[in-house]
Amino acid sequence: EMCIRDSIYIDDSSGLTPTEVRSRARRIAREHGGIGLIMIDYLQLMRVPALSDNRTLEIAEISRSLKALAKELNVPVVALSQLNRSLEQRADKRPVNSDLRESGSIEQDADLIMFIYRDEVYHENSDLKGIAEIIIGKQRNGPIGTVRLTFNGQWSRFDNYAGPQYDDE
């Protein structure tokens, strides 16, 4: 089902293949003079029927196809991804690139990998309540690191953080 409103096109079809996403994106770009952004929520819900017996190869094909689509249409593709549960076993729960579920090809193909971390999710008595961290795990053309934001849970909103950006400030 396609919802078109104020130049935002939402397709909530489930289990799309990269070929179907590419076809729909091309059509929208042709009919509306381009696309500003493609967002996939989330990558692991996509399928490649010919590779369905090997999930690693399937995710690799999905990742490569989305990268090719970004280049073809000259548009950023934001693909949301699940994390492995392995981070639950670590003392520091901040995600790292290898925590991306079926991560090898995603990590390789991505130009930018970002995570959102909120300490209060894992530690009830955290000193960092109301603070979120944007962790830049990979940036092909720039630095990696962490940026703090204020998180307003009532509105699910992130704002500029006015306090110290790092623990040692």
Task: Explain the meaning of each model-derived region.
Residues 2-4:
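Short, small-residue-biased leader/transition segments that mark boundaries at the very start
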Residues 9-11, 15-18, 22-35, 64-74, ...:
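C-terminal regions of RecA-like/P-loop NTPase motor modules
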Residues 27, 35-80:
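Helical hairpin unit composed of two closely spaced alpha helices linked by a short loop
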